[in-house]
């Protein structure tokens, strides 16, 4: 993979892009020119913020076994080149958000970038274990941006649905951090699993993960319907099952299984919202 593609964190941003599309389709949008504009804007803005994260965290990435081979610590890209690249992508994405999508969707594009690149990456990540709760609003923003593009406004159902992404984020990130808690301790990054006893961390993360799954099921019962319910139930069941398994076993392997199940659950939920839009 090209180092410049790696800077975009494609394995991370694809789910955010899907969330923006789900918001648009659920809000009443269709397969049209606005959808393709949304895809371009979402790719540029989320990719730009991810690249900025690479630039800002290059020092701690060099200290962690999970990240030391990233383009900046490994010397494949210079810091100045990465910064210029990230800012160019970000500025283009945010500008096009306002120009192509409109004021309200563009505002959500800007807010999504600010919450991840500034609030999470610059301000909170190295200071407090609550960092993820500030950065998590970036997930709300991508869904709401797509929804606002379709509806022209934002309502309570959209806000509640956007919190599915917000509540999914802490347990997903912390389950990954649990596996690499030694890295975070070494780098001095205050992720929760690196700060508390392992058994306590497992209990907290698995409980939050199960709660997020239950919230997603409740959301779909309230605002969804149709054939999509089956796939939501499948994702929720797998997530709750792996959460219980992790809570009982209290092993790194069990936590990893829980981590691997959480992204498919959110993906299935977002797909189900789009299916529901067409009353399938």
Swiss-Prot record:
Gene3D superfamilies, per database record: UbiA prenyltransferase
GO cellular component term, pick one: plasma membrane
Keywords: Cell membrane, Heme biosynthesis, Membrane, Transferase, Transmembrane, Transmembrane helix
Annotated membrane topology: Multi-pass membrane protein
Enzyme Commission identifier(s): 2.5.1.141
Locations listed in the record: Cell membrane
Catalyzed chemical reaction(s): heme b + (2E,6E)-farnesyl diphosphate + H2O = Fe(II)-heme o + diphosphate
GO biological process: heme biosynthetic process; heme O biosynthetic process
Superkingdom, natural source: Archaea
Any one Pfam family match given in the protein's UniProt record, by short name: UbiA
InterPro entries, per the entry: Protohaem_IX_farnesylTrfase, UbiA_prenyltransferase, UbiA_prenylTrfase_CS, UbiA_sf
A GO molecular-function annotation: protoheme IX farnesyltransferase activity
Biological pathway: Porphyrin-containing compound metabolism; heme O biosynthesis; heme O from protoheme: step 1/1
Chief place where the protein resides: membrane
PROSITE patterns noted in UniProt: UBIA
Residues passing through the membrane, by range: 12-32, 35-55, 76-96, 98-118, 129-149, 158-178, 199-221, 226-248, 255-275
UniProt miscellaneous comment: Carbon 2 of the heme B porphyrin ring is defined according to the Fischer nomenclature.
Function: Converts heme B (protoheme IX) to heme O by substitution of the vinyl group on carbon 2 of heme B porphyrin ring with a hydroxyethyl farnesyl side group.
Family assignment from sequence similarity: Belongs to the UbiA prenyltransferase family. Protoheme IX farnesyltransferase subfamily.
Name assigned to this protein: Protoheme IX farnesyltransferase 2
Gene: ctaB2
């Amino acid at each position: 993979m090209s180092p410049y593609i790696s800077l975009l964190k494609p394995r991370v941003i694809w789910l955010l892009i899907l969330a923006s599309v789900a918001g648009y389709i659920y809000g009443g949008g269709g397969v049209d020119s606005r959808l393709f504009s949304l895809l371009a804007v979402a790719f540029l803005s989320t990719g730009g913020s991810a690249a900025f994260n690479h630039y800002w965290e290059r020092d701690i990435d060099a200290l962690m076994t999970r990240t030391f081979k990233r383009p900046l610590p490994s010397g494949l890209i210079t810091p100045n080149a990465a910064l210029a690249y990230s800012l160019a992508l970000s500025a283009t994405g945010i500008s096009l958000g306002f120009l192509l999508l409109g004021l309200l969707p563009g505002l959500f594009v800007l807010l999504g970038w600010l919450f991840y690149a500034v609030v999470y990456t610059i301000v909170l990540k190295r200071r407090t274990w609550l960092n993820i709760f500030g950065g998590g609003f970036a997930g709300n923003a991508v869904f709401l941006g797509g929804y606002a593009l379709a509806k022209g406004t934002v309502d309570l159902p959209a806000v509640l649905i956007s919190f599915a992404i917000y509540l999914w984020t802490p347990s997903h990130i912390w389950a990954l951090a649990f596996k690499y808690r030694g890295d975070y301790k070494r780098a001095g990054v205050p992720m929760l699993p690196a700060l508390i006893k392992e058994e306590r961390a497992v209990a907290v993360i698995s409980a939050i993960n199960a709660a997020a799954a239950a919230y997603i099921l409740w959301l779909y019962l309230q605002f969804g319907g149709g054939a999509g319910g089956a796939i939501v139930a499948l994702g929720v069941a797998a997530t709750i099952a792996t959460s219980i398994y992790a809570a009982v076993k209290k092993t790194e392997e069990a936590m990893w299984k829980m981590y691997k199940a959480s992204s498919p659950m959110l993906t299935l939920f977002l797909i189900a919202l789009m299916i529901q839009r067409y009353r399938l």
